[in-house]
UniProtKB/Swiss-Prot annotation:
Function: Transcription factor required in complex with TAF3 for the differentiation of myoblasts into myocytes. The complex replaces TFIID at specific promoters at an early stage in the differentiation process.
First and last residue of the signal peptide: none
Location (main, coarse): cytoplasm
Gene Ontology biological process terms, A to Z: DNA-templated transcription initiation
One GO CC annotation: nucleus
Biased composition (Basic and acidic residues): 108-122
Xref: SUPFAM superfamilies: TATA-box binding protein-like
Entry protein name: TATA box-binding protein-like 2
Gene designation per UniProt: TBPL2
MF GO annotations: DNA binding; RNA polymerase II general transcription initiation factor activity
Region (Disordered): 103-184
Protein source organism: Pan troglodytes (Chimpanzee)
Length: 376
């Protein structure tokens, strides 16, 4: 279709392919300003008409979008999580994956793993909501001790939609937790029955008591039997009795220390006997605040011990100076007991307030001593 002639001052590039309109009346010479304005208004009206008639999908007015780009639809949760149907179909098939860069052992393990079928994957995706597609706790708790075969077996036993199968049953122990427990370093422990045959024996008990009166030590030393007093050497009277076989230190302030008893009852009985001796000498002695301050026990583990290896392994608890003292000094934190360990297997425990602390300390140290037993 032939287009009408254009005015000379209207550029031809501004209106390509415009529809035809009636030609202007012929003029002689240059057009006037009114004619130019009329032509301009007519041109703008034609452009506005074309803008209103342009289709919304026109390639001229719509942004260019590549054909291979897939836009997610937020209103559809299925497309938001499973956007590409082709990917969902091939998600369970790994036969086409190139595994040549992996070692032969890993490749063989991958071949042995059971693969979930496409039908089970589709049913699982349809039955579960997008929020329930998050990884289960069993998938998150994968540790060091789990190999690929155990993971594949546990995954193949899960059925789609069965939420009870995810949690382990309490009747069957979890083999994965056992493998993790075997990796964790632990202090060597032995059953209590192994060390039940060895019971520490109490060798000495130190107790204190308050007689609650001032004492004349010279008078006590002169009139009492089996008593000695040397103020230049020690500022207390040293008194002994035969039953129980103990020794007492009596101070002028009225405080007394009783040592040498083999049990708590013997220590109390001996302290009361010393208080009775002081009363018979004319002092108003009482028996107040009796308390056991220290208990000493000893035992024999019946095997030699490598003290050099023990002090290297337990440096923060032990000290060993064979030039100064032949025994290893082990300071236990709980219970707060000090142990003297000798290479022959003899053990001395001291620092306890009650008998149970002696037994507990020996039960704790016996597995450690057994780990450093001399073989030759």
């Amino acid at each position: 279709m032939a287009s009408a002639p254009w005015p000379e001052r209207v550029p031809r590039l501004l209106a390509p392919r415009l529809p035809s309109y009636p030609p202007p009346p012929p003029t002689v010479g240059l057009p006037s300003m009114e004619q130019e304005e009329a032509y301009l208004e007519l041109y703008l009206d034609q452009c506005a008409a074309q803008d209103g008639l342009a289709p919304p999908r026109s390639p001229l007015f719509s942004p260019v979008v590549p054909y291979d780009m897939y836009i997610l639809n937020a209103s559809n949760p299925d497309t938001a999580f499973n956007s590409n149907p082709e990917v969902k179909e091939t998600s369970g098939d790994f036969s086409s994956v190139d595994l040549s860069f992996l070692p032969d052992e890993v490749t063989q393990e991958n071949k042995d793993q059971p693969v979930i079928s496409k039908h089970e994957t589709e049913e699982n995706s349809e039955s579960q909501s997008p929020q329930s597609r998050l990884p289960s706790p069993s998938e998150q708790d994968v540790g060091l001790g789990l190999n690929s075969s155990s993971l594949s077996n546990s995954h193949s036993q899960l059925h789609p939609g069965d939420t009870d199968s995810v949690q382990p049953s309490p009747e069957k122990p979890n083999s994965d937790s056992l493998s993790l427990a075997s990796i964790t370093p632990m202090t060597p422990m032995t059953p209590i029955s192994e060390c039940c045959g060895i019971v520490p024996q109490l060798q000495n008990i130190v107790s204190t008591v308050n007689l609650a009166c001032k004492l004349d030590l010279k008078k006590i030393a002169l009139h009492a039997k089996n008593a000695e007093y040397n103020p230049k050497r020690f500022a207390a009277v040293i008194m002994r009795i035969r039953e129980p076989r103990t020794t007492a230190l009596i101070f002028s302030s009225g405080k007394m220390v009783c040592t040498g008893a083999k049990s708590e009852e013997q220590s109390r009985l001996a302290a009361r006997k010393y208080a009775r001796v002081v009363q018979k000498l004319g002092f108003p002695a009482k028996f107040l605040d009796f308390k056991i301050q220290n208990m000493v026990g000893s035992c024999d583990v019946k095997f030699p011990i490598r003290l050099e290896g023990l002090v290297l392994t337990h440096q923060q608890f032990s000290s060993y100076e064979p030039e100064l003292f032949p025994g290893l000094i082990y300071r236990m934190i709980k219970p707060r007991i000090v142990l003297l360990i000798f290479v022959s297997g003899k053990v001395v425990l001291t620092g306890a307030k009650v008998r149970a602390e002696i037994y507990e300390a020996f039960e704790n140290i016996y597995p450690i001593l057994k780990g450093f037993r001399k073989t030759t």
